[in-house]
């Protein structure tokens, strides 16, 4: 049983396989997948629904802020058959946790977006193949986030390495951004590296960046081991040259091993001023939207707080097969998109019972709400984020009307997995004193922007008791976001429970 495992295996080694021990639920493990670009097939989703269903009341899944899925409630003895099951349907959980490159994100509308600049799917797939291949990193100093932008609303500056579409001498490629991250100690948006790359060079360059980080990153101070600290140490010009040197070494090494298909060509990199084609905040992607393919639509569904149960996963798989092309897309806002829906199928899809729970037309408060898992599963979290967020949002819906969506990010602790600094309103689990007692509370951050003038949210209130949070947020929504207080005689708004 799991009790026989030594501490290092239980809390570190298993994470290389994507298996996570959760002290809050001893004996029940979490498995994090890798879903490059957030793409999952109906067949894969149906298999995952069966896995979660076998966990009974302990089973659930979460859509993450990296367009990924986490499965909860598994037993250790489930793991070997699960890994075989994942492999059979083309999925993996390898290197999805601890000091490894995490799921690679891209445009969730890749290939179907009327506003698409470039299809990110093959680029993201190539990067994942390189990172998980024989030349990929195995022991980074710290976790590492990579993302590829493909549309005018691809906000990616919270990643360690981000590729934003850009032109150079009339050719479409990518400008390189580096160093973005959130943590308990420091929060930074990525900065221009001063390089432009052709689209077919991203995987080789990413390998070179990670090879250098693996060799040169800080291993003595874990709280100063993210990429931006290395950039600070070397200076931007010094870091850029070190990465180019690493790339040249990688090309020679892989050529000797006859693995050069992942290496790329450093000579293709060009100096660049960091300008790019991303110009506005991300769309929510919800509702019925026309694809660039005539006669086809995607239907964006709001999944409250990204929480799924086995029945919902199985039903989603059925809807994707019945009404779409058998493919689902996951978004960083923890929502789901059914793609390639013919116009003739839209009415039937809209009539499906699941769409009363996962609505294509959520309220402006629900549409862009994001939450980490909270203390139901995470021992770092100070509050139950998902349940609290849903309860507070439903209360606010009864009190105010909003003219537009307000992006609200909830996180349980300063590690900031819920990305509170990206929210127009960010909330972070805390403690506060009320009536002489220490109680669960939330810090409030305001002002996060993900448009052409990106900005991290700043601290507004260092601790509001959860019991007072709806009152405080109501006032903020009225004063700063144009909300109008509802007539108390108005009927209730629809609500969805989140466990």
Residue spans of the language-model regions?
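Short acidic (Asp/Glu) and glycine-rich catalytic loops that position anionic groups and cofactors
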Residues: 26-28, 106, 183-190, 218-225, ...
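Gly/Thr-rich phosphate-binding loop signature of adenosyl cofactor/nucleotide-binding cores
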Residues: 1-49, 242-251, 255-322, 337, ...
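Long hydrophobic segments that form regular secondary structure
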Residues: 282-283, 288-299, 303-330, 465-499
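Flexible helix-coil linker/hinge segments at domain or subdomain boundaries
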Residues: 93-98, 212-221, 249-266, 358-366, ...
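Terminal amphipathic helices with adjacent charged low-complexity linkers/tails
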Residues: 77-78, 86-90, 214-288, 333, ...
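Small-residue-enriched alpha-helical segments and adjacent helix-cap loops
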Residues: 2-8, 28-175, 204, 302-437
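Short, flexible, solvent-exposed loop/turn segments with mixed acidic/basic and small polar residues
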Residues: 19-25, 57-63, 215-220, 288-293, ...
